[in-house]
């Protein structure tokens, strides 16, 4: 199979598998069919032996593990489009969950996340980000592994306690800035983030597997809870992309991708993001395709994505856009101009007329050139539309081989344990010093203590007796006075 069927008008609208790593865009207003389009693409890639990663935000993508139950609406769509090869079926699915509730746990270490993404997660300012950079440098220089949040908290405490010493070597470190980061870490931890950081850390190759019959495994990140923390959601997905870019070897253009990565609600990645962060996203998207990874952004409005990212998305599916405001009109104009024009279509006008499940589609051809834009209906998915059945969900969870691999957290010796030993030793030394000081103080106090009356009388008598004895001795030696 060299192409996948994604839509139909008079003809089948296909996507070239060899061009699937040139990335893509699924855009459109709420309720226009983006989620179903995502599901259809995931199904088609899986059929072709391409593993898929996607996030299930609304709870309606994990149902790809269930076959479609035909209804009148689906049957009518199949008839209208003259689709004869449709077969309701389920697809091989693995469920994952950062919080370890609805899927196998997904973890990363603090070191893997790195200072830039961590600063984004904690929403640090420039000064605080600089302190975090220094923390990672100190960690590297001193062999302090940063695996989980308590490792980072311990290192920050060490930096605050010895700020002047570290400042002389690494640059200015203020206790106030360190304290601000510590407070943000506590807040972050209270949101459940401690579940994400630690070991065993995710091996990305576990996302890149095929079933025994050669179909790509569809990895579904259960994200309905994660999505309530949008910065964590978007930064986590970017971390995954970054790790794929850093770990996978260069392969160039393949017959089909090694993995297709769907980034739903992609606008969150760029919302309030600093320029350096956006630049990193652009770089990762540009370069990860040579690692055999295709990235497909899903968002309501194409203008929510930077032009530098949009320009790299070769396969485009545009559902209806509404133009109620000047910004909406700008989006319609922008979307229409990105397509290779079809003389039979007024793209700017059609975008507002598209029905649910209908889209404007342009994919790259064999030469890597955009095809002329076509108006077509997305094929009905072969898996269930809606929320996954609880019994089937439990079966999928039970059968996930990575539940055992990642189910139990590991807490090996790292920065926290090493620094705790140092803190404990310092406390012992402080206690010994305090005891010695107290003992010395007690001895001196005893010497200065006023004598009692009895002690004074005894001392006087002894002194008098001593003087008398002394005189007797002297007389015995030198002779007494003559009378």
Tell what function each PLM region has.
Residues 105-111, 122, 317, 350-457:
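Conserved P-loop NTPase motor module
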Residues 445-483:
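Short, low-complexity, glycine-enriched hydrophobic/amphipathic alpha-helices that associate
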């Amino acid at each position: 199979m060299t192409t996948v069927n994604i839509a139909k008008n008079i003809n089948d609208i296909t996507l070239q598998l060899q061009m699937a790593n040139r990335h893509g865009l699924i855009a459109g207003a709420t309720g226009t069919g983006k989620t179903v389009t995502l599901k259809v693409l995931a199904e088609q890639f899986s059929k072709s032996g391409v593993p898929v990663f996607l996030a299930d935000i609304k709870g309606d993508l994990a149902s790809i593990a269930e076959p479609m139950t035909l209804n009148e609406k689906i049957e009518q769509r199949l008839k209208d489009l003259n689709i004869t090869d449709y077969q309701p079926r389920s697809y091989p699915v693995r469920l994952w969950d950062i919080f370890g509730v609805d899927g196998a746990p997904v973890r990363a270490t603090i070191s893997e996340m790195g200072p830039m993404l961590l600063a984004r997660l904690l929403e640090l300012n420039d000064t605080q980000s600089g302190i975090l950079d220094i923390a990672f440098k100190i960690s590297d220089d001193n062999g302090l592994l940063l695996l989980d949040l308590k490792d980072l908290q311990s290192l920050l405490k060490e930096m605050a306690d010895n700020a002047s010493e570290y400042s002389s070597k690494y640059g200015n470190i203020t206790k106030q800035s360190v304290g601000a980061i510590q407070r943000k870490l506590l807040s972050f931890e209270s949101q459940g983030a401690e579940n994400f950081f630690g070991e065993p850390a995710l091996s990305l190759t576990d996302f890149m597997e095929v079933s025994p019959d050669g179909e790509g495994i569809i990895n579904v990140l259960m994200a309905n809870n994660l999505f309530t923390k949008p910065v964590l959601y978007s930064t986590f997905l970017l971390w995954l992309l970054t790790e794929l870019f850093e770990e996978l070897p260069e392969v160039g253009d393949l017959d089909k991708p090694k993995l297709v990565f769907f980034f739903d609600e992609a606008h969150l990645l760029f919302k309030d993001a600093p320029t350096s962060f956006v630049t990193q996203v652009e770089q990762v998207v540009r370069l990860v395709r040579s690692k055999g990874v295709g990235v497909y952004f899903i968002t309501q409005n194409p203008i929510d994505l930077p032009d530098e990212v949009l320009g790299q998305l070769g396969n485009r599916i545009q559902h209806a856009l509404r133009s109620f405001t000047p910004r909406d009109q700008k989006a319609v104009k922008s979307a229409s101009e990105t397509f290779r024009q079809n003389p039979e279509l007024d793209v700017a006008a059609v975008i507002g007329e598209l029905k649910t499940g209908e889209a404007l589609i342009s994919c790259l051809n064999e030469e890597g050139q955009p095809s002329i834009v076509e108006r077509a209906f997305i094929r009905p998915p072969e898996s269930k539309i809606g929320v996954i059945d609880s019994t089937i969900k439990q079966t999928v969870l039970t059968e996930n081989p990575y539940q055992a691999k990642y189910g139990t957290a590991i807490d090996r010796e790292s920065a926290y344990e090493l620094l705790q030993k140092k803190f404990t030793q310092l406390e012992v030394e402080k206690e010994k010093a305090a005891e010695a000081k107290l003992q010395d103080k007690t001895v001196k106090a005893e010497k200065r203590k006023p004598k009692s009356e009895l002690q004074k009388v005894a001392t006087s008598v002894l002194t008098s007796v001593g003087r008398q004895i002394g005189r007797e001795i002297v007389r015995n030696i030198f002779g007494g006075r003559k009378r």
